[in-house]
């Protein structure tokens, strides 16, 4: 998770910035609102991603490597590259706290600054905030549907790369999940990891009940059992009930 995401932007942001400079408009004050329109499945969203958005803004820096790469494109003059070398966002950021319920056309973030500076932020902020807000909102809807029962986040293996897995887990917890199976995310964001066991655990034993009992013996106070390895209703659920009754008899 690179702290310097300066070039995490669409090329047209840079060509527009250069255009502002060449037309004497670079210092013109601009205001950008980050918002969403009417959703298809929900009338609200859960704001998320602000912490990473602020980290991104604070760490913007066009170093030698970035400048040399942009110079190699043959698109930009030295006056533009020189200004990028000294780039530091000096504008204002207003935003809703993470976890806030947000409605269509209500800004999650408002960026005010010179159009030269503010333009650069567009693509990265949309990437950061849109993804985490999407996950937090979906998590909130699932949690509401669960009606008070705890919901865990197990999305690591289906996430779109490691960063998405970590920040997706974070967003899910902000959206109301009680925990995540992602150990790295748990460490980074100071939560306790949660989880069951894999089908491979069950299949490593002679039978499902023996596997459940072995797991329960190891983790009696934190025992979650996966019941769909063979037959959920005919074996998984009855065997799990048997093991949990045995734990109860032992005082757990």
Task: Name every feature range the model reports, one short phrase each.
Residues 1-219, 246-249:
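Ordered alpha/beta subdomains of enzyme catalytic regions
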Residues 210-252:
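Acidic, glycine-rich loop-and-beta core segments that form the ion-binding/anion-interacting portion
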